[in-house]
Design a protein with these regions (language model features):
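C-terminal motif of bacterial Sec signal peptides marking the signal peptidase cleavage site
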Residues: 2-4
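Boundary regions of SH3-family modules and the immediately adjacent low-complexity/disordered segments
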Residues: 6-20, 46, 58-97, 143-274, ...
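SH3/SH3-like (including bacterial SH3b) beta-barrel domains
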Residues: 10-13, 27-50, 107-121
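Short loop/beta submotifs within extracellular cysteine-rich repeat domains
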Residues: 33, 64-66, 106, 113, ...
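Short, Lys/Arg- and Gly-enriched loop/turn segments at beta-strand edges
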Residues: 52-58, 133-144
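Short, solvent-exposed interaction modules
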Residues: 83-129
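Short beta-strand elements that form the blades of beta-propeller/WD-repeat-like
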Residues: 279-293, 336-350
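Structural motif
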Residues: 292-303, 351-370
């Protein structure tokens, strides 16, 4: 009976996965050894034997050799990356980005968190969520020394000074005199904790992980990106398309002067397309150039295309609120006419909830604002028509404008 059960014994295989860019397998652990195979980032290797700081593995081609443990991740960490991919497989894309250089996908935000897959520079990624964590101190940095509040020459031990005369010693022991207390040395307030932003991203193959935000360039068309005015453009969403045939048919009634219809400006005439051209209109969201903010954006700006001037113009602008991704683009029909729409959440108070694991921030009391685009006009729609209360001082935006004007 026992022998029959042994036939159903399942052999459990242990695997590790290459986290280094590339690494050679060696035939033995020694100062002098031979290379037997080259493995690359993401390769799965079957474990044959564990050594001290080394592991013996077999490749999918049957090649066997040793490599250092720090060049691979184990099954448990690999499973965490797989779970992260499954959990966010259906998350909406809030923006598209391009990597500035080669970057590792991390399982959580943070420079010291485990990483696995290496994404090549210039790769396109889908951006899913923004998280904020404390910035790791640079290597070798020491904590600031505590301020010394003792006065020079003061004896803080509570014992008589052995270098003082005997009469002074006896006096200090028998009847210590209370000296007037010196005012405490003012202590500088602690410096604010440095924070840094990370993006949860998904690559073309569906691999998911966290990347340092300042190493990812958001894919924003240059035509609207130039109007950022010193702010960080978080995303640009196409909302509508218009056909510019160069005739300047934006207004039904041309302005009149004493001699008839006013001709189009020479500048507008020069900008008119030679042939009909389709132009895209955008909803953009922006934020100050800071990390660690308790919101994703604090400004929304709609760029519409002027058929008279043949350029982008601001169709709508709102700033000074706490906005949160994603921005949803849609359509609605009213009286037989279909209009493009957009909506997003804002906070009604400074209270936010922060995920302790990944630093993703969400409003405790959110509101959803809805808008639709009617030609070149943006109108507010939806059930919530209450006034929009600004929840923070948009001083950063104003400072950026002032600095720009000063340069001019």
């Amino acid at each position: 009976m026992l022998s029959g059960c042994n036939r159903f014994h399942v052999i459990t295989r242990e695997y590790v996965y290459v986290s280094a860019r590339q690494v050679y397998l060696h035939d033995r652990v020694a100062a002098v050894s031979n290379r037997v195979a080259l493995v690359s980032n993401g390769d799965a290797l079957e474990v044959i034997e564990h050594g001290k700081r080394f592991v013996k593995v077999r490749t999918s081609k049957g090649e066997v050799g040793w490599l250092e443990e720090h060049a691979v991740i184990d099954d448990k960490l690999y499973a965490q990356f797989q779970d992260l991919q499954k959990k966010h497989a259906q998350d909406p894309v809030v923006a598209n980005g391009e990597l500035r250089d080669d970057l590792y996908l991390h399982v959580l935000p943070g420079r010291e968190t485990p990483h696995f897959l290496l994404e090549a520079g210039n790769s396109k990624v889908q951006m899913l969520a923004r998280g904020t964590v404390e910035k790791a101190p640079p290597p070798g940095s020491l904590p600031a020394p505590k301020p010394n509040t003792a006065q020079p020459g003061a004896n803080t031990s509570g014992k008589p000074d052995q270098s003082a005369p005997a009469s002074v010693k006896r006096a200090s022991v028998a009847a210590p005199t209370a000296a007037p207390a010196a005012p405490p040395t003012p202590v500088a307030p602690p410096a604010p904790v440095a924070m840094e932003d990370w993006w949860l991203v998904r690559d073309a193959a569906g691999h998911t992980g966290w990347l340092l935000a300042n190493r990812v360039d958001v894919d924003v068309p240059d035509e609207v990106g130039q109007y950022a005015e010193g702010q960080r453009m978080i995303a640009a969403y196409p909302i509508a398309k218009v056909l510019d045939d160069g005739t300047g048919r934006e207004h039904k009634h041309e302005k009149k002067d004493g001699k008839g219809a006013k001709p189009q400006d020479a500048e507008d005439a020069a900008a008119a397309p030679a042939a009909p051209k389709e132009e895209t209109e955008y909803v953009t969201v922006l934020s100050p150039q800071k990390n660690g903010l308790p919101y994703d954006f604090d400004q929304v700006r709609v760029f519409t295309w002027s058929l008279n001037h043949h350029r982008y113009e601001t169709g709508y602008r709102l700033h000074g609120f706490q906005g949160y991704l994603p921005v949803k683009i849609g359509q609605e029909t009213d009286k037989g006419v279909t209009y493009p729409t957009f909506s997003f959440q804002i906070a009604t108070s400074p209270d936010v909830s922060i995920d302790p694991d990944n630093g993703v921030t969400r409003p405790v009391h959110p509101r959803t604002l809805e808008f639709r685009l009617e030609g070149n006009l943006v109108r507010r729609t939806g059930a919530d028509q209450a006034p929009i209360i600004l929840t923070h001082d948009p001083a950063d935006s104003e400072k950026a404008k002032a600095a720009k004007k000063k340069k001019r």
